[in-house]
């Protein structure tokens, strides 16, 4: 009984194995894109695929290899551009062509490498800019007098 309980509560190791399996599956899909002639002229394709894989894994909350509505909601809120339920459904429909309610990794990479513009394509750009922006000031704010107030 105690062995059974300890296996059930071994979340860290199980989660690590789950993420490793997911990363292997996504790496297989990356290899398909690297071998595809359609993307042979894409600059820095291996680096882009690595970045896409990291972002996809970060927002795949249910670890099923798909970004669902709630994962997309979290992604948009993290970017500071919260969307309504209907807007997010429309985004998913645009990316998947209306075939699915979730965004698969293939759909995600096709969208990121594709020529058409989508809101999700901004994710990588905004997160990159957010990380590169100047650091926030530390310490107490400077003193102000009455004349400087609006």
Swiss-Prot record:
PROSITE patterns registered for this protein in UniProt: EF_HAND_2
Q: Name one GO biological process term.
A: actin filament bundle assembly
- Is the Calcium keyword given for this protein? yes
User: GO MF terms on file?
Assistant: actin filament binding; calcium ion binding
Q: Where does Ca(2+) bind?
A: 60, 62, 64, 66
Record-level GO cellular component terms: actin filament; cytoplasm; ruffle membrane
Query: Per its UniProt record, what Pfam families does this chain match?
Result: AIF-1
List the subcellular locations. Answer: Cytoplasm, Cytoskeleton; Cell projection, Ruffle membrane
- Chief localization class? cytoplasm
Q: PTM N-acetylserine: at which residues?
A: 2
Keywords linked to the UniProt accession: Acetylation, Actin-binding, Calcium, Cell membrane, Cell projection, Cytoplasm, Cytoskeleton, Membrane, Metal-binding, Phosphoprotein, Repeat
Enumerate the residue ranges of region (Disordered). 129-150
Residue intervals of the EF-hand domain: 47-82, 83-117
* Assembly and binders: Homodimer (Potential). Monomer.
Task: State the protein's name.
Answer: Allograft inflammatory factor 1-like
What taxonomic lineage is listed for the species of origin?
A: Eukaryota, Metazoa, Chordata, Craniata, Vertebrata
């Amino acid at each position: 009984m105690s062995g059974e309980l300890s296996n059930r509560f071994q979340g860290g190791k199980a989660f690590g194995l789950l993420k490793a399996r997911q990363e292997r599956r996504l790496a297989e899909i990356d290899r398909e894109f690297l071998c595809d002639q359609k993307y042979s002229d894409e600059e820095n394709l291996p680096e882009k695929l690595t970045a896409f894989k990291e972002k996809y894994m970060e927002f795949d909350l249910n670890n099923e290899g798909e970004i669902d509505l709630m994962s997309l909601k979290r992604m948009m809120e993290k970017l500071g551009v919260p969307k309504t339920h209907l807007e997010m459904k429309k985004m998913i429909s645009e990316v998947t062509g209306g075939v699915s309610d979730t965004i698969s990794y293939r759909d995600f990479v096709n969208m990121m490498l594709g020529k058409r513009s989508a809101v999700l394509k901004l994710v990588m750009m905004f997160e990159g800019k957010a990380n590169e922006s100047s650091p926030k000031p530390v310490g107490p704010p400077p003193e102000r007098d009455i004349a400087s107030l609006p």
